[in-house]
A protein has these predicted regions:
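Substrate-binding/active-site clefts of carbohydrate-active enzymes
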Residues: 1-3, 14-16, 20, 37, ...
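Acidic, His- and aromatic-enriched active-site or binding-groove loops in soluble protein domains
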Residues: 5-11, 44-68, 158-160
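Short helix-terminating capping/connector loops at secondary-structure junctions
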Residues: 22-24, 89-92
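Asparagine-centered strand-capping/turn motif at beta-strand->loop junctions
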Residues: 246-250
Length: 250
């Protein structure tokens, strides 16, 4: 079934059941192929770090597009995104997550300033925003951790949330040897409490970007998009019935 026709039909049946029994529920696919998953009945689809989307070109490669060295490329990502957008417009949402439990952390390849620019992109694109816990404070990928239940190389992206600057990061009162996965033990590990008190922190910037998105219909999930430039800077227009906004990511 190279075109996934049988799989699509199965999920269409599940969507029909869901609409009848749980009309307020939403289905989110982890396919990274919105041209198939949204037709299959999912309300939204994640782009993933593998497959044809070129999502990795933006954040997770030797020369990410959002790196200061400006040696990356968004061309193939934009081309793939536009193709999927044309196929799926009106059928559901294409979502670009900051990360998830299977990917390296954003902060593995990007510093704080670069992360701010990356979040400006993520929070000005169509689709529902998905921010993996801790990405909003720049939690790091922790190297060298013992694999837990098949985590292998993904384990470093699954460490406990860092709430404050206490020894346990505000995560648990348990002894550290009882933790499911070890904490980031770095002395300068970021935490939510400290960043909430800093106007120039990554968390504060993400909070401002979320508020700006919520205040502008063109930037929200269903606002339309058209790309003006796929080089440096990345330029696109977001439009709704109420407004048009030109986004320049530099």
């Amino acid at each position: 079934d190279p075109e996934s026709k049988g799989t699509i039909a199965l999920w269409q049946n599940i969507r029909e059941f869901l609409d009848e029994e749980f009309p307020d529920a939403a289905m989110v696919s982890e396919w990274g192929e919105p041209d198939k998953s949204l037709i299959g009945g999912f309300h939204m689809d994640f782009l993933l770090h593998f497959g044809p989307s070129h999502y990795n070109d933006l954040f997770r490669c030797d020369h990410p597009y959002f790196s200061k060295d400006a040696e990356g490329s968004a061309k193939e990502f934009v081309a793939a995104y536009q193709a999927n957008y044309a196929k799926t417009d009106g059928k559901g949402l294409i979502c670009i997550p900051s990360g998830n439990h299977d990917m390296d952390r954003l902060a593995k390849n990007l510093d704080t300033d670069e992360l701010k620019v990356a979040f400006a992109f993520l929070l000005s694109m169509p689709g529902a925003p998905f921010i993996y816990y801790g990405d909003e404070i720049g939690m790091r990928y922790v190297e060298g951790l013992t694999s837990v239940e098949g985590g292998y190389g993904r384990t470093g992206s699954r460490t406990p949330m860092q709430w404050d600057d206490s020894l346990s990061a505000g995560f648990s009162a348990a002894r550290k040897d009882k933790y499911y996965i070890a904490l980031d033990e770095s002395a300068d590990r970021p935490n939510a409490k400290t960043q909430s008190e800093q106007e120039d922190s990554l968390r504060s910037e993400v909070k401002r970007l979320i508020a700006f998105r919520k205040a502008n219909p063109a930037l929200q999930s269903k606002g339309e998009i058209s790309f003006v430039s796929d080089e440096y800077p990345l330029v696109y227009k977001r439009t709704s019935a109420e407004q048009e906004i030109t986004v320049i990511i530099n």
